Amino acid sequence: MTMHDCFVFPAAPHLPAPDMPAVERWMLRERIILPAVGADVPAKALYALSHAISCLPGANVPLVDADWRTAADVVATHVQAGNLPDALRVNGDGSVEDCVKAIRDHGIALDDAWLFGKHAACTWFSPRYRAGPGMVRLYDPDRIGEIDHLSIVLFQIDAGEPPFVVFGAGTSAPTVPGEDTEREDFPPFGDYMDFIGAVYEDLHVDWVHPDSGRRYALLDLDWEYSLGIGRCFIQFEDGSGYDLERFVQALGEACGQRMTYAHRLF
């Protein structure tokens, strides 16, 4: 099964990063995302919580129910299945984080399988959020039906960790602005993969065009929105990216720097 995620991030990742908690507050204030409590927890977060509970010693097979609306629904299903004790009590209108705390406070060693994949490399990350009416105003009206399926998480990679790279099945050689054909060679690095590798080691690395003498950062090239790199991201799980252009523009205006996006097929 093909998975399709979209990532929004600074177009100049070597410059000072935006304040990601401030970006989160702006998105909540504008109701681009909704507080992740009660029935506004996205399905992806509910399924991740269920997966983590299913990994407990002695638990039954993984459980998934399309009728789940809250994190408490997930817990109730696992209590009924015998994966959690009958005495466990959680807030019916709480968050996934509230339920995890209640489970652990009950003496159950629930691991971090409910978190998103890159959490261990992060200095900060948000809960998974559902899109709100503010996102509806910024979304492609022809694709608005997809918005309920989005799960949105903000994260910042720790400075001591390698940068995060958005790279997938759709990534291929880029085009230099003003040129008509894809370019494979990027001397002195080698091919475009070698250039990506050099920037992965140092975000400040750029490339000098051998003919024009012009300098290009990695993301100055046209990757047809199939490559991203940096430390600050907003991930739209199950999002394509093409429908987010107005959001990207609004975000750039809000945080005072140009933003871009990339989509990943895997």
Explain the meaning of each model-derived region.
Residues 200-266:
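Long, charge-rich boundary regions
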Residues 1-170:
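N-terminal alpha-helical interaction blocks
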Residues 23-29, 195-197, 234:
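Generic hydrophobic, helix-prone segments enriched in Leu/Val/Ile
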Residues 145-225:
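Cys/His-rich short segments
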Residues 3, 24, 71-75, 95, ...:
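Generic detector of bulky aromatic hydrophobic side chains
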